[in-house]
Amino acid sequence: WIPSHPVAGTEKSGPTAGQENLFENRWTIITPSKNAKEPDIKKVSLFWETMGSKVKIMSPDEHDKILSITSHLPHVVAYNIVKTVMGHDKKMQNDIIQYSAGGLRDFTRIAASEPTMWRDIFIDNSDLIIEAIDKFSKNLDELKKVIADKDGKKLIEIFNKSKELRKSIIKAGQETDKPDFGRK
């Protein structure tokens, strides 16, 4: 048994959502079982490399921990932002939709992902997702306090650190124009 997770995709699903270059320069994580044989792992790796993927082999636990931060937590946040928008009266919802900027559009794109798949991910990886939510909540509380204190210096420090992480993601090749993941 040799599970693979191509870390590529969009909020769209089904046969019509396919893109020929979807896996190009994207990571595929292979999490072989303890009984997997090396020649079989190499075959699976070669398959993904042929599709244009970069391949990384890791344990299922390492995969789940990393993805709880890089993928699952952003979905939690996106669903909660949408829920917050929907908590307003209809007129305000319409105004929010009409004047939505890139930030909200990006979050709603993520929140438009396939519900059944995300239900299953949230249930199957619940412990690590809850751990990520706890860390996020702690950081959000700290940010809330900085905002309440009107601590401009601390806000700039937080924003600059965030900017540096973004630069690191770009430098690592994890933000490219191709394939287009619905960001345009």
Q: PLM features: what roles do these ranges have?
A:
Residues 1-16:
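Rossmann-like NAD(P)(H) cofactor-binding subdomain of soluble oxidoreductases
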Residues 11, 36-37, 129:
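Alpha-helix N-cap/loop-to-helix initiation residues
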Residues 16-22, 119-120:
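Short, flexible, solvent-exposed loop/turn segments with mixed acidic/basic and small polar residues
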Residues 21-106:
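Internal alpha-helical scaffold of NAD(P)-dependent oxidoreductase catalytic cores
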Residues 91, 156-158, 179-184:
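Short alpha-helical linear motifs
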Residues 93-162:
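Interdomain hinge/lid region at the active-site interface
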Residues 164-184:
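Long, positively charged, glycine-interspersed low-complexity recognition regions
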